[in-house]
């Protein structure tokens, strides 16, 4: 209860909490739309929407580190190391809850980069499950177009330019499909809506 009280009394933390919820919804919407764009089976499109909603659920286990300030100067390093584990923590949290392997693998590997530089397993190329490759693109895009405490939201063109500069992280075919998709969408209406496609 002490943790919950501290969170509720901290306006900045509460704003971040709401931002996290919206982030999950936006990633869910984007992942579903990209899956439809590349003509994945409807069941996988739906499962990607589920995975998008839950992809950062492992951060819940990091909440004590995230939301309670500590005087320890090693705190930031510990926090970052713990956050790098959040894909596995999310997988572990959900593995016995009836989710499909497709959903679980998409969540577990959503921070893998196409060139092998990601985490938690340094997978590369098509060894990364397609759901995770889709989430990687959508997660980065949504992060860029969302306002943060330390910067304003980027417009769509700036976000895509940034992603082009980091294109080694993404499956090129999927990224080109995503760029084509974004050109056809109203991002505020189709991705940044507050209700998920589920």
What are these regions (language model features)?
Residues 3-198:
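Metal-dependent catalytic cores of enzymes that make or break cyclic nucleotides
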């Amino acid at each position: 209860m002490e943790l919950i009280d501290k969170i509720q009394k901290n306006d900045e933390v509460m704003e971040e909490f709401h931002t996290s919820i919206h982030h999950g919804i936006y990633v869910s919407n984007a992942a579903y739309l990209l899956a439809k764009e590349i003509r994945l089976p409807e069941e996988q499109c739906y499962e990607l929407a589920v995975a998008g909603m839950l992809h950062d659920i492992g951060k819940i286990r990091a909440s004590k580190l995230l939301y309670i300030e500590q005087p320890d100067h090693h705190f930031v390093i510990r926090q970052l190391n713990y956050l790098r584990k959040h894909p596995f923590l999310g997988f572990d949290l959900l593995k016995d809850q009836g989710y499909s392997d497709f959903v679980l693998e998409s969540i577990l590997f959503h921070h893998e980069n196409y060139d092998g530089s990601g985490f938690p397993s340094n997978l590369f190329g098509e060894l990364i499950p397609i759901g995770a490759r889709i989430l990687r693109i959508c997660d980065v895009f949504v992060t860029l177009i969302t306002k943060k405490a330390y910067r304003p939201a980027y417009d769509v063109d700036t976000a895509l330019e940034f992603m082009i500069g980091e294109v080694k992280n993404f499956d090129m075919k999927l990224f080109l499909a995503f760029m084509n998709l974004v050109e056809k969408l109203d991002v505020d209406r189709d991705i940044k809506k507050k209700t998920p496609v589920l």
